[in-house]
Structure formats: C-alpha cells, structure tokens
Amino acid sequence: MSTNFEIVRRQANQDLELFHVAERAVVPSRANGRGIDLHKLTHEETIKLVRRVFFSGATTPQVVVFSGIEHGSGCSWVCARTAQVLAAHVESPVCLVEANLRFPSLHRYFETVVPGDASNLWLLSHGAKQADRQATAGLDRLQSQVSDLRANFAHILIDAPPINAYADAVLLAGIADGLVMIVEANNTPREAAMRAKEVVDAAGIRLLGAVLNKRTFPIPERLYRKL
C-alpha cells in the first residue's frame, strides 16, 4: 500500500474515518442486541456473487457500487457480506466504503481489528447520520477521494443510497467500474424495479449484476432483461 494511504486517512478524518476491521463481521440483532455471525450466513451464495461480479469477465472491476432500489432492501448487509467474503479470498487490500451518509450502518457490522490480525479488510465509514445538505457535501468529497482509493486498494466496494430515492448511486457509479443492484425479494414492486433500471440505463452505467436479498444470489441475465 502506497504512502497515499495516509493521505486518504487524513482527508477522510473529518467526514469519513478509515478503520482496519476484522474479516469476521457481525450483524446487530434488533431483538436482543447481540451480533449475528455473517460468516455462517449464505456463504456459498455470496461466493457465487463475488465470482460473478469480480472474476467472471476479462477485466476485474476495481470500484463497484452497491445500491438498492428503495429503502429497506438490505443493500448495506449485502455489500458488507460481499466485502467480507472477497477479502477472505484475496490477499490484496479491500476497502468497504460507507456512502449512504443519510443512513449509515456499516460501522455496526464490523469490529475494529486487533493488533497482530492479518485482516486485509478496511472500512471507510461515517457513524453519524447526516442531513441532506451535509450528505451532499460528503458525497462530493467522497467522489474526489476515489482516485486515491484506487491507488491504495485492489478492490473498493461502495454502499450507496437507493437508486429511486437519491442520485448518489448513479453519480458514484459514473466514476466506478459498475453497479450491483439490490432487489428485495417478494417486496420490491415491478414498477420500482423498472424505474431504477431506466435510470441506470439512461446514465450509461455498467450493470454488473442484480441480487435478490434474502436469497442473495445473482439474477441470471436472461431474467434481469425481463424486469
């Protein structure tokens, strides 16, 4: 990792803070406050997603944006899980970026790394909820940092706000290598999915895959085309 890594840390200090986190992530349980071990959940399905998104083509995308269609799709969970599995299968550094600044949650999924841990997973996160004006300014600063992140990490996964709610996901995907769309199984209206697809297509964004949350596997391309 180059010396630019320290520059990224200093630039992010006031808005987004960079943490070295343990590869084994946890999801807080709303019922009892305990963590649920992500490692035991949908491991095989997530490996398939990692292979499809990052290793199925002639070129490997370095920066990938994850975005749901609407609020409540579980995008942050899918993005966190994908980053954890990816980091466990590569030796190069992986950075998970919190770009959903209005409703940040990634910081709840990971524990800070302990001394001597060989984890190659990093989290660029903001733990406090921001108002629209602050989130817009934070997005601008994050966009300016993408080139530094590219110089320091082999893989960057960005958790973005919903496509149909804000323009953030499309703006970030425009400077990334592609987008993964999260669809909530049995709950996302067909019209909402169609509207999100039209937004992505109109912006010329490369769609790397779509994921049905709660099933967590890529939708075959032939089915996605029917959305």
Where are these regions (language model features)?
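Conserved Switch II/interswitch segment of TRAFAC-class P-loop GTPases
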Residues: 163-164, 176-193
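P-loop/Walker-type NTP enzyme "switch/lid" segment
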Residues: 23-41, 47, 51, 55-58, ...
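Short coil/loop residues immediately preceding or within conserved phosphate-binding loops
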Residues: 61
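C-terminal lobe/tail of nucleotide-utilizing enzymes
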Residues: 1-50, 194-227
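Generic detector of well-ordered alpha-helical packing
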Residues: 7, 99-101, 160, 185, ...
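Conserved beta-strand position immediately N-terminal to the Walker
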Residues: 64
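Active-site signature of alpha/beta-hydrolase-fold catalytic machinery across serine-
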Residues: 81, 85
